[in-house]
């Protein structure tokens, strides 16, 4: 779906300031925000790419709802880990690739332990990722791009440069890519630069859309754009001029299609 009604956006600077305000005067903890953001990502996946029934035979149980979650080193990656946990509980079969982890961070260690307790497998090399995606019988239904968020500054560095290059160069035969907040590799305010574009099919803007979201919805036909992260109070919404965004939610919705 291409762009329809206009929507307000938050620049990278404003998004950073809003995040800081949420965790100071707003009294939110980082794990609260990450849990709500990751839940919004999972709900978007469920709505746009609902799970198929798992088939059971006498010999094995086949889950056709495989999801590859590409996890970055920061909060965006944490959102992906949370989403993977929810999806596992909703009859998906997530697999994570997490090549660069924060050192000695209890929050991320807990998220990983939660996935391990659910028997969520982890790939450890890019070669494994390529083999999985290039295999005709891989059955990957969706790729979640939770590598870089709104704080990303180019250029893209390893261990993610080769991964993003691979996604961009092979997007024609890959399953749909769902990007969390920003298509990884894009500048939050300016959009895609001269580097490879991963050609995401769906974008989930968190808190409020960033300027690159407008470029995303106009970058091709059938682009899907959702808003998630319903935790902004009216005072903050007014302060940042995003009342119209907050008011798009209806009833108990945690996500809304823009």
Curated annotation (Swiss-Prot):
Residues reported to bind K(+): 76, 145, 184
Keywords from UniProt, A to Z, are: Cytoplasm, Isomerase, Metal-binding, Mitochondrion, NAD, NADP, Nucleotide-binding, Potassium
Q: Which GO terms describe its molecular function?
A: metal ion binding; NAD(P)HX epimerase activity; nucleotide binding
Write down the chemical reaction(s) this protein catalyses: (6R)-NADHX = (6S)-NADHX; (6R)-NADPHX = (6S)-NADPHX
Cofactor(s) needed by this chain: K(+)
InterPro entries, alphabetized? YjeF_N_dom, YjeF_N_dom_sf, YJEFN_prot_NAXE-like
Q: Which cysteines are joined by disulfide bonds?
A: none
Gene Ontology CC entries for this record: mitochondrion
> Chief localization class?
cytoplasm
Question: For (6S)-NADPHX, which residues are the binding ones?
Answer: 75-79, 149-155, 181
The record's EC number reads 5.1.99.6
- Tell me how the cofactor is bound: Binds 1 potassium ion per subunit.
State the top-level EC class. isomerase
Primary role:
Catalyzes the epimerization of the S- and R-forms of NAD(P)HX, a damaged form of NAD(P)H that is a result of enzymatic or heat-dependent hydration. This is a prerequisite for the S-specific NAD(P)H-hydrate dehydratase to allow the repair of both epimers of NAD(P)HX.
Its recorded name reads NAD(P)H-hydrate epimerase
Record organism: Candida albicans (strain WO-1) (Yeast)
